[in-house]
A protein has these predicted regions:
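Accessory alpha-helical/coil subdomains and C-terminal extensions
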Residues: 1-158
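Phosphate-moiety recognition in structured ligand-binding domains
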Residues: 154, 162-270
Length: 270
């Protein structure tokens, strides 16, 4: 959620979901949907029938019930992937999965729209994990929020437009800093190879200083390894760097989000 948090601090959207907070608070999908729906309703009372919600790409993995479901699906498809792939009918494919899931997770899976069910069971990435960038979490939330609003006594206008910026957010034109930083990383990596060192990752620090004062170094890849389940087996992988909920960026966001939710406070960083 690093990019999502930074975008929130720079633009002040009405709602921003931070995956790490969802996991820490053990929030359910329904609780997230209720929060969004309540904000939409509160803004509607102020005759502000518009708003912006920022959702991180990997959110679905951080919702505890969905995380359990994805882990179970990864295990199931690692063991019975061939039998699943041989089924051509979509409904039969979903029944195949539901019949093999624990009852608690089967009910979660069955409650999802079929488009999301299919996306959760599509081809895995090379590590055997669900490809979260291909799961249309934003469309799932729109459908669930729409259903939640219909159950409210007030008649609330809700017509959502979704946009996926998973790649656009990482492919903007590089700044001078980006160019200097990447050049330095590459130059340093070549120096590490030239010194005959392997299994190290190049790093540059002291980045707040001018480029000529940056410091180069190398860190062993093993120092960053973590054991995770991949293809139904334990594998060493580099652990993800997560948003620190006690860090200053998140704390600044947390202090202001209730205001941004109700009072339109959009800003343009450009």
């Amino acid at each position: 959620s690093h990019i999502t948090l930074e975008c929130a601090l720079k633009t002040h959207p009405n709602i921003t979901i931070i995956s790490e907070e969802v996991a820490a608070k053990k929030q359910t999908l329904d609780e997230i949907v209720t929060c969004i729906a309540n904000t939409v309703a509160a803004r509607a009372k102020n005759k502000e029938n518009f708003g912006v919600v920022l959702i991180p790409e990997g959110l679905i993995e951080f919702i505890p019930e969905m995380n359990k479901l994805i882990s179970e699906l990864n295990e199931l498809l690692a063991k019975e992937g061939e039998a699943f792939a041989a089924i051509e009918n979509k409904d039969e494919k979903m029944k195949f999965v539901i019949d093999r899931l624990p009852a608690e997770l089967a009910s979660v899976f069955a409650s999802l729209p079929q488009t999301i069910q299919i996306q959760l069971t599509n081809d895995r990435d090379p590590h055997g994990n669900v490809q979260v960038s291909l799961i249309e979490t934003e469309k799932l939330l729109v459908e669930l929020v729409k259903g939640k609003l219909k159950k409210m006594p007030e008649k609330i206008k809700f017509s959502a437009q979704t946009h996926f910026f998973g790649y656009e957010g990482r492919c903007s034109v590089p700044s001078n800093f980006d160019a200097d930083y990447c050049y330095s990383l590459g130059y340093n990596a070549a120096a590490i190879i030239g010194a005959g060192k392997t299994a190290y990752m190049s790093y540059i620090n002291n980045l707040v200083a001018p480029a000529e004062q940056w410091k180069a170094g190398a860190v062993p890849l093993t120092a960053m390894m973590n054991v995770e389940r991949r293809h139904g087996a334990d594998k060493p992988v580099i652990k993800k760097a997560l948003v620190e909920l006690d860090g200053k960026p998140f704390q600044e966001f947390a202090r202001n989000r209730d205001t941004w939710a109700i009072k339109t406070s959009f800003i343009f960083p450009g």
